[in-house]
UniProtKB/Swiss-Prot annotation:
Broad class of the protein's primary localization: cytoplasm
SUPFAM superfamilies found in the cross-reference section: Aldolase
Family statement: Belongs to the transaldolase family. Type 3A subfamily.
Protein species of origin: Salmonella heidelberg (strain SL476)
Keyword Cytoplasm: yes
Gene name per UniProt: fsa
Protein name: Fructose-6-phosphate aldolase
Localization per Swiss-Prot or TrEMBL: Cytoplasm
GO molecular function term, any single one: fructose 6-phosphate aldolase activity
PROSITE patterns in the record: TRANSALDOLASE_1, TRANSALDOLASE_2
Active site residues of this protein: K85
């Protein structure tokens, strides 16, 4: 299983990398824009934060296949081994096919249906990123869509994997993992929610109080 953080906040990546067993960091144009840093400045800093073995994801901005391929090559030259995120449009599918031939690893992003995700995988994307909460927000069933996509990839594109994205709660992320997803990416607030469980803190305080009442200190 691969766990990613969905952010361009270098300080938070450095902090959480000491806590979570993260495989890397995913970004998108909105996330990079929120950082107020040039993508060419922030990507090397993020790569340094996750280490050489960590995988970094960044997205193209062009709307046409030719431009996507050119931008993907530029990203790959700047950060060797980067996974290039390509929106799964008609032009995006063409770009994914071309980049597969170039040996550049891609992720099909902005996936709102299982059929759309399957096409990205068949075109050559290693990762496919369904938008779970955004599907829910549009009146759909994000988890069911992920379940369908996971089954389709297992049967028809086993070399590709679902990297589920767009979460508002830890429950959504866990449901994707229960559906068989091999990778998820968490926004910082959801990652923090997984750590902040009041009942855990209450239990620890009870252990400490019982120990102190018995032995007069908190030493082992």
């Amino acid at each position: 299983m691969e766990l990613y953080l969905d952010t361009a906040n270098v300080a938070e990546v450095e902090r959480l990398a000491h806590i979570f067993p993260i495989a890397g960091v995913t970004t998108n144009p909105s996330i990079v824009a929120a950082s107020k840093e040039s993508i060419w400045d922030v990507l090397p800093r993020l790569q340094n934060a996750i280490g050489e073995e960590g995988t970094l994801f960044a997205q193209t901005m062009s709307r046409d296949a030719k431009g996507m391929v050119e931008e993907a090559k530029r990203l790959n030259n700047a950060i060797p081994g980067i996974v290039v995120k390509i929106p799964v449009t008609a032009e995006g599918l063409a770009a994914i096919k071309l980049l597969k031939k170039e040996g550049i690893v891609t992720l099909g992003t902005a996936v709102y249906s299982a059929s759309q995700g399957l096409l990205a995988a068949l075109a050559g994307a290693k990762y496919v990123a369904p938008y779970v909460n955004r599907v829910d927000a549009q009146g759909g069933d994000g988890i069911r869509m992920v379940q369908e996509l996971q089954t389709l990839l297992e049967h028809h594109a086993p070399d590709s994997m679902v990297l589920a994205a767009s979460f508002k709660t830890p429950r959504q992320a866990l449901d994707c993992l229960l559906a068989g997803c091999q990778a998820i990416t968490l926004p910082l607030d959801v990652a923090q929610q997984m750590l902040n469980t009041p009942a855990v803190e209450s239990a620890i305080e009870k252990f400490e109080q019982d120990w102190k009442n018995a032995f007069g200190n908190l030493n082992l």
